[in-house]
């Protein structure tokens, strides 16, 4: 069901199979705007695709759905866990440390890789965050919307303030994507453009360090 121009090998994709009609599965896919159907054989091929980080048929499913879930406790725990992971992981590939690490690496790409390869890598970063969904502005907007709902559920107006700050940070992530796309299209040897991109990333990291540290103290 993927359009031809969106077909490329990526083993980190997730989707929801919510029903079945004969040999077709009813699927909700995050990159497709409407529900779609997928033949059992096609879905099986995708689930057992080869390559790096092969999914090996991995499936998540609920074993028990409580009749009256404690959404307040779950929301608090979710916020705390996200804030902890964004600010406290020791590995410099995730969270705020990961953002700063990317900024440092990106700034060196022209010298290390050459301008042509550096542009390709910037293009890959922008595509990953804007189209594939591994970060960037969209995730910040989504999480800000979640915080707005959490503010109402938990009766904590302060979460509305944090949501506004995170939305503003999402705007800066979108600026990064736009500037990155312009760099790729210009095809000029402009090391200053890479420094500017890195500066936007560091600004986003600083903002998110403050935002998620604040969230840890709130919940």
Regions found by a protein language model. Give the residues of each.
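Generic detector of ordered, mature protein regions
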Residues: 3-6, 38-40, 51, 56, ...
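Charged, long alpha-helical assembly modules
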Residues: 128-219
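Active-site-adjacent substructure of cysteine-protease-like catalytic cores
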Residues: 1-29, 219
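Noncatalytic regulatory segments and standalone regulatory/sensor domains
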Residues: 20-134
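Residue-level detector of alpha-helix boundaries and kinks
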Residues: 2, 124-125, 193
């Amino acid at each position: 069901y993927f359009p031809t121009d969106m077909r490329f090998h990526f083993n980190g994709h997730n989707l929801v199979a919510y029903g079945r009609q004969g040999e077709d599965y009813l699927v909700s896919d995050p990159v497709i705007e409407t529900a779609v159907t997928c033949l059992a054989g096609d879905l099986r091929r995708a689930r057992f695709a080869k390559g790096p980080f092969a999914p090996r048929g991995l499936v998540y499913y609920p074993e028990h759905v409580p009749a009256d879930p404690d959404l307040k406790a779950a929301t608090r725990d979710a916020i705390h866990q996200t804030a902890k992971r964004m600010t406290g992981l020791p590995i410099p590939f995730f969270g705020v440390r990961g953002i700063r690490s990317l900024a440092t690496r990106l700034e060196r790409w022209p010298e290390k890789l050459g301008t042509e390869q550096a542009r390709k890598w910037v293009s890959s970063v922008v595509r990953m965050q804007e189209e594939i969904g591994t970060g960037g502005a969209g995730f910040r907007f989504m999480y800000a919307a979640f915080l707005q709902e959490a503010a109402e559920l938990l009766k904590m107006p302060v979460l509305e303030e944090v949501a506004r700050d995170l939305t503003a940070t999402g705007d800066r992530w979108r600026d990064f994507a736009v500037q990155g796309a312009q760099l790729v299209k210009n095809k000029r040897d402009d090391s200053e453009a890479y420094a500017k991109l890195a500066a936007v990333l560091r600004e986003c990291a600083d903002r998110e360090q403050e935002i998620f540290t604040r969230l840890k103290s709130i919940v």
